[in-house]
Amino acid sequence: MANHPGRAPRAPMVGAKADLKPLGRVIRMLFQDYPAMLIAVMACIIISAVVGILPAIYIETITSYIEDGLRLGWDGVSGKILHALVTMVCIYLAGLACTAVYTQLMAHVTQGFLHKLRTRMFAGMQKLPIRYFDQNSRGDIMSYYTNDIDTLRQLVSQSLPQLFAAGLTVIGLLLFMFYFSIPLMLIVFLGIFCMTKVTKNVGGRSAKYFLSQQKSLGKVEGYIEEMMNGQKVVKVFCHEEAAERDFDAINEQLFSDANHAQRYANIFMPIMGNIGNILYVLTAFLGGVLICSGGNIPNLSFQNLFETGSMLAPLKIAVVASFLGMTKQFTGNVSQVSQQINAIVMAAAGASRVFELIDQQPEEDNGHVTLIRASEAADGTLTESAVRTGVWAWKCPQEDGSRKLVKLCGDVRFFDVDFAYDPEKPVLHDITLYAKPGQKLAFVGATGAGKTTITNLINRFYDLADGKIRYDGININHIKKADLRHSLGIVLQDVNLFTGTVMDNIRYGKLDATDEECIAAAKLANAHDFITRLPDGYNTMLTANGANLSQGQRQLLSIARAAVADPPVMILDEATSSIDTRTELLVQRGMDALMKGRTVFVIAHRLSTVQNSDAIMVLDHGRIIERGSHEKLIAERGTYYQLYTGAFELE
C-alpha cells in the first residue's frame, strides 16, 4: 500500500494488552460532572439488583408453603402463599420503577458527558500546533469524534451500569447460595473456575481482535476521506486501479480483524451458556442425591445454624428449588459480566485515543508583545485607542514596567535562520532576507525547496531552530502568536470555505467587520460582480467547501477574506497555480489591489506572477542561491534564467 505523507502510522493492536487506566479517568470525570445523578443511579441499581435476587430466595419460602400445604391443605397455607405472591409483585414493581429511573438518568448523564467531552476535545484541538495536524491524518482525527466517542457512549450508557448491576447481583447470589448450602456452593465454584478460563482465553482473544478492528476501521475511514478529497487527482493520473488495490489491502485487514473478533465473540456466549446448563444439571443432581440420602448425607449451611442451632441438617426440596433458580440467575449474570469485556476493552482503547487528543500539549506561546489599536499624533507619537483608527501598534513591555508602542508597519527580516521539521533533516539553511514595508518578495524553487516553510516561520506555525526573525524590529518570538497572526493575511492555493453565507465567509477574516467593509473587500478582490449574480447574492449559502463555486470564484472569496482583515503583511502561497490562465487574469487583478501598500511574500509556480517583485529569492534545498530583481536575475543567466527560459522546471 502506498505511503501517505503526514500520516503517523500506528502499530497493530493484535497481541497487545488493553490499558484499562483510561476507564478510571472516565469514571472520575463522570462523578466530577454528575455526582448527584450518579449516586441516584447507583442507589437505583443496588435496589434493582436486590430486587433481582429476592424472587429466587422467595421461591424457597413459597416451596416450603407448598410442602406445608400438602400436609395442611390449601386453607392452611393460602394466606401465606397469597401474601408471598403480593410481596413478589411489589418487589418486581419496585425493581421496574428503579430500572426506569436509572435508565432515564443514565441517558441524560451519557449525552451530557459526551457533549462535554466533545467540547473539551474540540477546545483542546483548537490549541494544538500545526505540527500535530501535519503528522496525523484527518481520517484518524475524525475517528476520535465518531468511532471512539461511540464506544464511550456504549460504555457509559450500557456497559458500566450493566457491569455494576450484574456484579452486585453475582456477589449477592454467592452470599445467599453460601447461606443456603455449602456443598452445592462447591459446584458453583467449579462453574466459576470454568467460566473464568473461558473468559480469559476466548474473551481475551476476542477483545484483542476487537481492538485491532477499531484501528483498522479508522484506517479505512481515513483512506476513504483521502480518496474523496483527491478524486480529481486520482482520475487525472488514471490511478483508479491502484487506489482500489490500496483500499482492498486495508479493507482486507479490516475484514480479517472483524472476522476473527466475531468468530470468538460468537462462540463465547454459547460456551458460557452451556457451562451454565451443565452447572444447573450438576447442582440438581447433587441436590437430589442429598435429598434422597434421607439425611444420611446432611447439608452444611448457615441457614440450618439459624433455624436449628446446628449447621448440619437434611437438605430440603425448597432449598434445592431456590438454589437452582439462583444458579441459573448466577450463570446468566456472570455471562453478562463476561459479555461486557469486549465493549469495555474497545471503550478503553477509544478512551485512550480520546485522552491522547485531549492531553496533547497545546501550542506554546511565550510571547508578551501584543497588538493594539492606536492613534498617531502629527509628531508621530502613538497612544493606545479604544476605537478603530486604522492604525495598529505593538505594545512592548519594558523592564521598568512601562509600555513602549511600536507602529505596525510590516518590516520583516530574517537573520541566519535554520530550521528542520525533523532534527536529522534540516530544511532551511542560513536564510537571511529583508522585506521593507510595502515591498514584494517572491520565492521561487522546486517543490521541497523550503518556500512554504519560510512562510510557516513568519506565522510561527513552527519555531526556528537557529537565527532570528524581526518584525518591525521586534523578535518574532516575543510577539504573542494570536497577535502576530492577526497582523498577517494569507491566500492559499487550496481555498477553505466554511458552511455559511458568502458574507460570513468574507467576514471570517475580521469577525467584527461590517457588511459595508465586507462588500468593499469583495470589490477590491474583483469578487463583487460574480457574488451579485449568485441566487441570493451575499446571502447565498455555501456548503461542502464552496462546491457550488468555481475554483476561480473560491479564490476570489479567499482574496476578499484576506482584504477585509486589512493586514500590513500578506502571504500568497501559490495562489494562482491551480486555475486557468483566463481566470488568473481576474484573480491577479484582485491580488494586485490586495498587495498595494503591503509587505508581500509570494510563492508561485508561474514566474509571470512574480516578475514585478522588488526581490526574487531562488531557493534550492533550503538555501537561497540567487536573489535580486527579475531583470538582475535574467542578466545573471543563472538558475532563475534557466527556469524562466524553460531549460529547468520547477517540479
Residue ranges and their predicted role:
Residues 38-101, 178-183, 285, 292-317:
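Transmembrane helix-loop-helix hairpins at lipid-water interfaces of multipass membrane proteins
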Residues 33, 37-50, 91, 158-212, ...:
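Transmembrane helices of ABC transporter permease
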Residues 69-70, 176-190, 260, 264-352, ...:
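Helix-loop-helix
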Residues 1-52, 67-87, 102-106, 110, ...:
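Membrane-integrated ABC transporters
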Residues 12-16, 51-67, 90-138, 142, ...:
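Juxtamembrane helix-loop junctions of ABC transporter transmembrane domains
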Residues 35, 130-131, 147-156, 160, ...:
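An intracellular "coupling" helix at the cytosolic face of ABC transporter transmembrane type-1 domains
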Residues 43, 98, 102, 110, ...:
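Hydrophobic alpha-helical transmembrane segments of ABC transporter permease domains
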Residues 74, 374-651:
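ABC-type nucleotide-binding domain
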